[in-house]
Regions:
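Binding-site signature for planar aromatic cofactors or substrates
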Residues: 1-266
Length: 266
């Protein structure tokens, strides 16, 4: 059985050059890292194999050099999505995978053109599929906002979330995800569209989509936002939950793109 070939809609979504895709990696001590990885594409010459360009992925590459386990989220503009796990295999400096990455519109016309190499991932499992109705997005965003107003998830610990980051996470029309390391040791990435500022040092969300996994209380988590303007930030911290409400006490914040891709800003 082929995970990619036997899952309706997944290959077409992966082939979309602008389809939002996220790659989660882990450090040796189990800290998750999750970033947009739009360059993820299916390898047309091998089953259940993905390639990606080494482009603005500094922390991810460092993690892959120490632990090959990855989590992947693919989500379409219609909010249909797939949650995968996989194993990083290798980097290739030359060959068809590199050529295909370099010929993509994302890299061909980018001011920061060029990839160092192409990474190869073997898909291991399909963890979940989902489809999020638009009305559910509105409902969950409102419920998360209500939780924040009521003070849920606020605390004295953590670092203040900078205003530019708060402004982006306050947007409803953006792709937001949540990642953590599962008991199997593999990172898991799920949609968290309702993620938004809570207190000065927290982010809150509402888990209204049935069937999706969620991190246990106290877990080390990472969340990332990708806006329509290709702005991205990543926040890391500690997870707490009460019913369907969840919160992150933020410990670290990173920029996702130029001029400081992967650089810590808080």
């Amino acid at each position: 059985m082929s995970v990619l070939n036997d899952t309706p809609g997944l290959l077409d979504a992966l082939r979309g050059e602008m389809t939002p895709k996220f790659l989660a990696t882990r450090s040796p001590d189990g800290a998750p890292n999750v970033v947009p990885c739009i360059t993820l594409l299916p390898a047309e010459d091998a089953p259940d194999t993905l390639t990606f360009g080494n482009f603005l992925l500094r922390k991810s590459i460092k993690n892959l050099e120490q632990d090959r386990r990855v989590g992947i989220l693919v989500i379409t503009t219609d909010l249909q999505g797939w949650i995968l796990t996989g194993d990083f295999l290798e980097f290739q400096r030359t060959g068809p995978y590199v050529d295909r990455q370099m010929s993509s519109s994302l890299l061909r016309y980018n001011a920061y053109t060029g990839i160092r190499n192409a990474g190869v991932i073997r898909v291991r499992s399909m963890e979940a599929t989902f489809a999020i109705p638009r009305l559910e997005v509105l409902r969950d965003f409102a419920l998360a906002r209500l939780s924040a107003i009521r003070g849920w998830g606020q605390g004295e610990e953590g670092v203040p979330v900078p205003l530019p980051v708060r402004r982006e996470f306050a947007k409803m029309v953006a792709v937001k995800v949540l990642a953590w390391v599962s008991p199997t040791g593999y990172p898991v990435v799920v949609p968290a569209i309702s993620m938004q500022p809570g207190g000065n040092t927290s982010l809150v969300c509402w888990n209204g989509t049935p069937g999706l996994p969620h991190p246990p209380p106290g877990a080390s988590v990472a969340t990332n936002i990708l806006t329509l303007d290709a702005v991205s930030y990543q926040a890391k911290g500690t997870w707490s939950a009460s019913g369907r409400a969840g919160a992150i006490q933020v410990r670290e914040i990173y920029a996702g793109g130029p001029p400081l891709p992967g650089g810590r800003i808080a």
